[in-house]
């Protein structure tokens, strides 16, 4: 993937950044694509860096993700909860599966979606081959993860665990308005009012 370079004029002349580093200067993290251990580690490093820079200033996590590995997503989620800096979440395009879970885990009152974004929740996916005993062990672990994710999603959305269990039995798609009613986000935004941008 080609990453754009941004050139800025400073008192010392020109300085070039890749676009993600430039966004980081404004406390913006962009989570685009599937969530795996590599992506998770990069997001966590950025969260920790911004926390160290200013623990009282908001961090803006933009999400455009189909989801990914549960443990990788949970590492991001736990870091969001661990740091003092409030993490605002913004869905751009789609937040599905673990992407939707992270969207819901943003600071209450600061979870947003753009007008035409799609949000989807479902139960964890897993596939494993091997001996019957090993398959049973992994099936039990998936059930434990499912229970934990349902409990946390219920906590963040205000829905009952029973409703979350029923709705995540299959892919459950939502518009921004649906996600707001459901409690996954707090507002739909059409203009950038959260990071100081204007048009």
Swiss-Prot record:
Which keywords does UniProt give here? Cytoplasm, Hydrolase, Protease, Serine protease
Gene Ontology cellular-component terms for this entry are:
cytoplasm; endopeptidase Clp complex
The record's SUPFAM superfamilies line, in alphabetical order, gives: ClpP/crotonase
Q: Which CDD domains match?
A: S14_ClpP_2 (cd07017)
Write out the coiled-coil annotation as residue ranges. Answer: none
Substrates-to-products reaction catalysed: Hydrolysis of proteins to small peptides in the presence of ATP and magnesium. alpha-casein is the usual test substrate. In the absence of ATP, only oligopeptides shorter than five residues are hydrolyzed (such as succinyl-Leu-Tyr-|-NHMec, and Leu-Tyr-Leu-|-Tyr-Trp, in which cleavage of the -Tyr-|-Leu- and -Tyr-|-Trp bonds also occurs)
Known EC number: 3.4.21.92
Keyword Hydrolase belongs to the record? yes
> What does the UniProt entry say about where the protein is found?
Cytoplasm
UniProt key word Hydrolase: yes
Question: What's one GO MF term for it?
Answer: ATPase binding
Catalytic residue positions? 97 (nucleophile), 122
The UniProt entry's GO biological process terms, in alphabetical order, are: protein quality control for misfolded or incompletely synthesized proteins
Q: List the disulfide bonds.
A: none
The kind of enzyme this is, by top-level EC class, is hydrolase
Q: Name one Pfam family in it.
A: CLP_protease
Signal sequence residues: none
What is the protein's known function? Cleaves peptides in various proteins in a process that requires ATP hydrolysis. Has a chymotrypsin-like activity. Plays a major role in the degradation of misfolded proteins.
Q: How does it assemble?
A: Fourteen ClpP subunits assemble into 2 heptameric rings which stack back to back to give a disk-like structure with a central cavity, resembling the structure of eukaryotic proteasomes.
Family that this chain belongs to: Belongs to the peptidase S14 family.
Q: What name has this protein been given in UniProt?
A: ATP-dependent Clp protease proteolytic subunit
């Amino acid at each position: 993937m080609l990453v754009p370079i941004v050139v800025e004029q400073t008192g010392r002349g020109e300085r070039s950044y890749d676009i993600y580093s430039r966004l980081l200067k404004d406390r913006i993290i962009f989570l685009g694509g599937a969530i795996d251990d590599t992506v998770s580690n990069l997001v966590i490093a950025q969260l920790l860096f911004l926390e160290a820079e200013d623990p009282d200033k908001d961090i803006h996590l933009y999400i455009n993700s189909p989801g990914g590995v549960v443990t990788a997503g949970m590492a991001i989620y736990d870091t969001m909860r661990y740091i003092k800096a409030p993490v605002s979440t913004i869905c751009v395009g789609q937040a599905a599966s673990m992407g939707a879970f992270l969207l819901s885990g943003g600071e209450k009152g600061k979870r947003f979606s753009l007008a035409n974004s799609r949000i989807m929740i479902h139960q964890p996916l897993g596939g494993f081959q091997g001996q019957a005993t090993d398959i049973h062990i992994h099936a039990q672990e998936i059930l434990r993860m499912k229970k934990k994710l349902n409990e946390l999603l219920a906590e963040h959305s205000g829905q009952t665990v029973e409703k979350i269990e029923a709705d995540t039995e299959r892919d459950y798609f939502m518009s921004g308005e649906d996600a707001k009613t459901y409690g996954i986000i707090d507002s739909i935004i059409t203009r950038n009012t959260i990071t100081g941008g204007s048009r």
